[in-house]
C-alpha cells in the first residue's frame, strides 16, 4: 500500500519519479552538518516524572503529496510517556503555521505511548507490521495512532545502532504487556505530589454521599430512593462504588447477599416519577437448589420495586437482544481503516468505493441502533410512565452507554458543560466501566479492547450535530475528550473501577506515614489548554435555560411544553416470567459473547409505540431545554468528520463547512449585542462570553472545515479527481490536455 502510493522513499528502484533521496541527498547532510546539528538540538521538555528511554538522530519526518516529498530533519525520541519528534518547525512542511489550538501536554509531533495503535516498517517499498524482536530493521517507520494520525519517519540516514535502539524501544514500550503500577500515570503523580488542581467546584465527582443526595434532590428522586454506604471501604464488592443509590425499601443485607449483584441500582429519575435502573446478573449456577435460591431472591427484589409507590417495571436485557461487544469491536476495526491513510494516492484510490466500505463496516448502523434503543427506553419512561431496568452481566458497558444517552436526551442539565462531565463521572467512572481494559492500556488482552466510550461520544456527536443550540459544549470538546482517553496524567480513564483507583493510589494504605497520591482529572481543562483555546470547547450559541419564578414553577413542575401534547399509553407491567428469564443460563450464554445474527436487519424500525412517540415529537417545534430526540433515518446518521477526517488534507473544505457558518452567525450575534448595548447605554451591563466569537473564527475564510485541527494543513496540489477514474479519461497525454474538473466532496 505504501509503495503503491509513492511513499516508498530511498531504495525505490522501480519508482518512475524521483524518490525521497533526490530531495535530501547524503552529501547535503554531510556538507551542511552544522545546520543539521542546530536543528537537532531542539529542546525536549520533559514532564514531571518523565524519563528519556532512547533516541535516534538524523531522522526525517515527512509527508507524502503526490509527486513532491517534503520532510523535516531532527531527532526521534522515546520516553516512558510518549514518542516525540524534535525538528525544525519552521520548515517547508509546516510553512509558517501558527498553532493557536495548542495542547500544553501533547505537541503536534508527540504521540502518547497509549495512543499508538499499530507500527509498520517499510522494507524495499513493502509495508509490514512490526512485532517483538526484529532480525532486520526497516528504513522507514510508519505509526498509526488511535486518534487516527499517521506519521512517517525515514531512518535511512540514521546510524544503524540508533535505528535498532529506537525501533526496538518503540515496539517494546508500545506493545509489551505492562503492570498497572508501571504506567507513567504513577510516575507523574509521584513527581507532582500534592499539586493537583481540584475541579470539584464545577464537576460533581460522585465519590461522597453528599454528591448522590444532591443528584437525588435535583431529579426529585429522593422520595423513592436512598443513598447507601454499605460498600464504604469496598467491604461488599470491589466492582461497585463506595456509595450508590437503591430503592428505599431495599435492605443492606440484600446488597450483601450476592456482592451487589441482582440489585436494582438507580441511575436517574424522570419528571413524572419513573426511573431508570440497572442491574448486574447473578453468578452462573448449575445446581438446581442454588438456582432456586437466586429465583427466590430476585422474586423478593422484584416485589419490592413493583409495588406502590413504584411504577411498573420493564426489563431490557442488553445481553440477549442488543449489541455484543465483539460486534462493536469488529465494526470499529473496519471503520477506522477508512481514515488511516498513508498517502494522497491511497486516499483517491479508495474514493470511489469509500461509501461502500463505510456501509460494510456497520459503524454508523451501530450508532443508529444505540440511538433507537435509547428512544424506546425514553418512550417507556416518558409516555408509558414505567420504570426501566437495564440488565447486563456487569452493568458496566452497554448499561453505561444507554443510561447516559437517555439522560442526555431527557435531561437538559446533562447537556451543559458541568452536567455532561458529571454524567460521565456518575455513569462511567463510578459506574465501573473498565477503561483500563476497554482501551487496552496495559496491552494484556486485545480481545478486551472495545471502544464503548467512543461509541457513546459518537452518539452524542450525532445529537450535537443535529441540535447545536441545545448543548453548552461543542464537537471540538467531544474530540479532545476522545483524545484524552490516551493521556496518562489523568486518572479519569485509566482504571477499571473506583476500587482499583483508590487501592493503587494508596487511599487504602494501612501505613499512616504513607500519603495517597493525587492525580489530576481530565475535567481540569486548564492543564491541557490555555483560556483562548478553551473558548473553542464552549458553544457560543448556547443559551441557558431561563429561571422561572415560584408561580411559574408550580404550574410546570413535571411537564415541559413538548410533552403535554404527546399521547400517553396505558402502563403495562412486565410479566414476571420475563423478569426471571434474564438471570438464568440463557442470560449467561449471551453475556459470554453469543453473536446475534442478522440483528441489524431485524431492528430497522422502531416499535409501534416508540414510532408514534418519535413522529409526534419531530412534528413539533424543538424545545432545546426539554426532551431532545435525534433523527435516526439512514442519511441522518453521519460520520464525525472533525474527529475521523481531521488529519486528511484532501477531505477538507478550505474556507467552508460548518466553521464558516458558525463564524458568520457569531458576527451577526456580536453586531446585535453591540447595538443593544448602545441603545441601553450600558457598556458593562454583562459579560458577553456566550456570544463573543473566538478570535480564531473571525476570519473563517482562512479556516478549514475541520478547524481547529486542520487550520493550516497543506492541501494536495493534485486536481480533485479520483485516480480510479483516470483510465476512463484516456491516457496520460490526453488527460494533460483536459481542464481540471472540480468534484465537490459535500458534507461527509
Curated annotation (Swiss-Prot):
Gene Ontology terms: biological process: phosphatidylinositol dephosphorylation
Subcellular location(s) of the protein: Cytoplasm; Sarcoplasmic reticulum; Cytoplasm, Myofibril, Sarcomere
Residues annotated with Phosphoserine modification: 565, 602
Native organism: Rattus norvegicus
Comp. bias (Basic residues): 553-562
Annotated segments matching region Disordered: 549-576
Amino acid composition bias (Polar residues), ranges on this chain: 563-573
UniProt name for this protein: Myotubularin-related protein 12
Superkingdom, natural source: Eukaryota
Domain Myotubularin phosphatase: 206-644
GO cellular component: cytoplasm; membrane; sarcomere; sarcoplasmic reticulum
InterPro entries, sorted: MTMR12-like_C (IPR022587), MTMR12_PTP (IPR030576), Myotubularin (IPR030564), Myotubularin-like_Pase_dom (IPR010569), PH-like_dom_sf (IPR011993), Prot-tyrosine_phosphatase-like (IPR029021)
Amino acid at each position: 500500500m505504501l509503495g503503491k502510493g509513492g511513499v516508498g522513499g530511498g531504495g525505490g528502484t522501480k519508482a518512475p519519479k524521483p524518490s525521497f533521496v533526490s530531495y535530501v541527498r547524503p552529501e547535503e547532510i554531510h556538507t551542511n552538518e552544522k545546520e543539521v546539528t542546530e536543528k537537532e538540538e531542539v529542546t525536549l521538555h520533559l514532564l514531571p516524572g518523565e524519563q528519556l528511554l532512547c533516541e535516534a538522530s538524523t531522522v526525517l519526518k515527512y509527508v507524502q503529496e503526490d509527486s513532491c516529498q517534503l520532510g523535516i530533519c531532527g531527532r526521534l525520541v522515546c520516553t516512558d510517556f510518549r514518542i516525540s519528534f524534535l525538528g525544525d518547525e519552521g520548515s517547508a512542511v509546516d510553512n509558517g503555521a501558527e498553532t493557536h489550538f495548542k495542547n500544553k501536554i501533547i505537541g503536534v509531533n508527540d504521540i502518547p505511548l497509549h495512543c499508538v495503535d499499530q507500527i509498520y516498517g517499510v522494507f524495499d517499498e513493502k509495508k509490514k507490521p512490526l512485532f517483538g524482536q526484529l532480525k532486520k530493521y526497516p528504513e522507514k517507520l510508519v505509526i498509526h495512532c488511535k486518534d487516527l494520525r499517521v506519521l512517517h519517519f525515514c531512518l535511512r540516514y540514521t546510524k544503524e545502532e540508533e535505528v535498532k535502539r529506537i525501533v526496538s524501544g518503540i515496539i517494546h514500550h508500545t506493545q509489551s504487556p505492562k503492570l498497572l503500577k508501571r504506567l507513567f500515570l504513577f510516575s507523574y503523580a509521584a513527581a507532582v505530589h500534592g499539586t493537583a488542581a481540584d475541579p470539584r467546584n464545577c464537576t460533581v465527582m460522585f465519590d461522597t454521599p453528599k454528591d448522590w443526595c444532591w443528584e437525588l434532590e435535583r431529579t426529585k428522586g429522593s422520595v423513592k430512593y436512598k443513598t447507601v454506604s454499605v460498600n464504604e471501604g469496598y467491604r461488599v464488592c470491589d466492582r461497585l462504588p463506595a456509595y450508590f443509590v437503591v430503592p428505599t425499601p431495599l435492605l443492606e443485607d440484600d446488597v450483601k447477599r450476592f456482592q451487589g449483584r441482582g440489585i436494582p441500582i438507580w441511575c436517574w429519575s424522570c419528571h413524572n416519577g419513573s426511573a431508570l435502573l440497572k442491574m448486574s446478573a447473578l453468578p452462573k449456577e448449575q445446581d438446581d437448589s442454588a438456582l432456586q435460591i437466586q429465583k427466590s431472591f430476585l422474586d423478593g427484589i422484584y416485589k419490592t420495586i413493583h409495588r406502590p409507590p413504584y411504577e411498573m417495571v420493564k426489563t431490557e436485557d442488553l445481553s440477549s437482544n442488543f449489541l455484543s461487544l465483539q460486534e462493536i469491536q469488529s465494526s470499529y476495526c473496519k471503520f477506522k481503516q477508512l481514515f488511516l491513510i498513508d498517502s494522497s494516492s491511497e486516499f483517491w484510490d479508495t474514493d470511489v468505493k469509500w461509501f461502500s466500505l463505510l456501509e460494510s463496516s456497520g459503524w454508523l448502523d451501530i450508532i443508529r441502533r444505540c440511538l433507537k434503543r435509547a428512544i424506546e427506553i425514553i418512550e417507556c419512561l416518558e409516555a408509558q410512565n414505567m420504570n426501566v431496568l437495564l440488565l447486563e452481566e456487569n452493568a458496566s458497558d452497554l448499561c453505561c452507554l444507554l443510561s447516559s444517552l437517555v439522560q442526555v436526551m431527557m435531561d437538559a442539565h446533562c447537556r451543559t458543560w458541568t452536567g455532561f462531565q458529571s454524567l460521565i463521572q456518575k455513569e462511567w467512572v463510578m459506574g465501573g466501566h473498565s477503561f483500563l481494559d476497554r482501551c487496552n492500556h496495559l496491552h494484556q488482552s486485545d480481545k478486551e479492547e472495545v471502544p464503548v466510550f467512543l461509541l457513546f461520544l459518537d452518539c452524542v456527536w450525532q445529537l450535537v450535530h443535529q441540535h447545536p443550540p441545545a448543548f453548552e459544549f461543542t464537537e471540538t470538546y467531544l474530540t479532545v475528550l476522545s483524545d484524552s482517553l490516551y493521556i496518562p496524567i489523568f486518572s479519569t480513564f485509566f482504571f477499571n473501577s473506583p476500587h482499583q483507583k483508590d487501592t493503587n493510589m494508596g487511599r487504602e494504605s494501612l501505613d499512616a506515614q504513607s500519603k495517597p497520591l493525587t492525580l489530576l482529572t481530565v475535567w481540569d481543562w486548564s492543564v491541557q489548554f490555555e483560556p483562548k483555546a478553551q473558548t473553542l470547547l464552549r458553544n457560543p450559541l448556547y443559551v441557558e435555560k431561563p429561571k422561572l419564578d415560584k408561580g411559574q414553577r408550580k404550574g410546570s413542575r413535571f411537564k415541559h411544553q413538548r410533552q403535554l401534547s404527546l399521547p400517553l399509553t396505558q402502563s403495562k407491567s412486565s410479566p414476571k416470567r420475563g423478569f426471571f428469564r434474564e438471570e438464568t443460563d440463557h442470560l449467561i450464554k449471551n453475556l459470554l459473547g453469543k453473536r446475534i445474527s442478522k440483528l441489524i436487519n431485524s431492528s430497522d424500525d422502531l416499535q409501534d409505540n416508540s414510532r408514534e412517540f418519535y413522529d409526534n415529537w419531530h412534528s413539533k417545534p424543538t424545545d432545546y431545554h426539554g426532551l431532545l430526540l435525534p433523527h435516526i433515518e439512514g442519511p441522518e446518521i453521519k460520520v464525525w468528520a472533525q474527529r475521523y477526517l481531521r488529519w486528511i488534507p484532501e477531505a477538507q473544505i478550505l474556507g467552508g463547512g460548518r466553521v464558516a457558518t458558525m463564524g458568520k452567525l457569531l458576527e451577526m450575534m456580536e453586531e446585535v449585542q453591540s447595538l443593544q448595548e448602545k441603545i441601553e447605554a450600558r457598556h458593562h451591563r454583562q459579560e458577553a462570553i456566550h456570544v463573543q466569537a473566538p478570535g480564531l473564527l473571525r476570519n473563517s475564510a482562512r479556516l478549514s472545515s475541520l478547524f481547529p485541527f486542520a487550520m493550516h494543513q497543506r492541501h494536495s496540489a493534485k486536481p480533485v479527481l479520483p485516480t480510479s477514474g483516470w483510465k476512463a479519461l484516456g491516457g496520460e497525454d490526453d488527460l494533460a490536455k483536459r481542464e481540471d474538473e472540480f468534484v465537490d466532496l459535500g458534507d461527509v
